[in-house]
Amino acid sequence: MADLAQVTYCGLYCGLCSQRNRIPPRARALQEAMHKDGWELWGPGIPGFEAFWSFLGGLASSEPRCSCREGRCGPPFCGIRKCAQEKGIEVCAFCDDYPCERILGLAKGYVTLLADGQRMRAIGIDAWIQEQEERCKTGFAYVDIRCEPYEVPDK
């Protein structure tokens, strides 16, 4: 069985989240550039700098700690997670009701979600995860193509 640690119940891949694959390296690069320019020495004289520097350090050193499966990512009230757990479904794409109203709502913001779900069903979860790992290597993040805000019904 596949390691689903980076696969959400709805069918997103955590490695394609900018909070995992984009923000920490960019924060590290900014922190390093500012360090090289001496900001640690003269920045504290600027109001709010210490809070900013601390926040930047946190972003730069952040490790992925989120986990949909453990309820540490996404809204704590996520109806998709709750539904999948109640049905004993590992990923919604394998549910007989896929795509349901909740998934269709989420797909308005994550435009690859439905195609990814169909692909997952066609090739299996293990091969799909490998494809997502390759996708990660390109630098792609879901936010690159998010086209509109989404709302997931609570039902």
Which residues fall in each region the model found?
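Short flanking/linker segments adjacent to small metal-binding domains or redox-active Cys/His motifs
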Residues: A60-R72, I129-K155
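Hydrophobic scaffolds flanking metal-cofactor catalytic centers in soluble metalloenzymes
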Residues: M1-V91, Y98-W128
